Amino acid sequence: NVLLIDGTGAAAQPGQTVIVQNGVITEVGPVKKVKVPAGALTVDGTGRTLMPGMIGMHDHMYYSAAGGRSAQMSYTGPRLYLGAGVTTIRTTGSQSPYGDINLKRRIDQGMVPGPRIYVTTPYLTGPGGGGTMSVAETPEQARRFVAYWAEEGASWIKFYTNISREAMGAAIDEAHKQGMKATGHLCSVTFREAVDLHIDDLAHGGMTA
């Protein structure tokens, strides 16, 4: 008897029954028309809303605090995402990439609760930018960076403001060869240049190049 938002853009539908078997939705319809299988575990949805899990496309597993400090949230982070209805996230830039990768593995193995995670590499920038971020001075360094993190389990790479066009192009090419995708918080490379280099996604569009 739940209010159902099905994610298609259709109006919310009250008084719906949703049947789930072995983790798969097998039937959806009005309470009076859908027969609940004998012995099924039931949840009374009266006064509740059911909708598909949301997908977060720009998320982090760390929390920035005053004074330039930050804290990794490997325990609370995934639980907070689930609590907000977010069942898939992309960590768009990581300060603790191994922490994110290991967390993803634990979630995938059912050891801890959390959303499906697409892990992004550490931020990749150019000389003179990004503080403790990884720096690629040459296209070859950029390729090696991507190949390394692909092997470690990252599925996206994120560029930061000082990356050069040449290093970025090489990294995107290598990422696509490795089955990865690329995004960027850009400045030294314009959005048009990034598109010409076949970047997959652009971050912070309203505040960068």
Where in the sequence are the language-model features?
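Histidine-rich, glycine-flanked metal-binding segment
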Residues: L4, T8-M51
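Divalent-metal coordination cores built from histidine and acidic residues
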Residues: G45-S64, S70-L186, T190-A209
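Short, flexible helix-adjacent loops and helix caps
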Residues: G7-G9, A66-R69
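Residues that scaffold the ATP/ADP-binding catalytic core of kinase and kinase-like folds
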Residues: V28, S64-A65
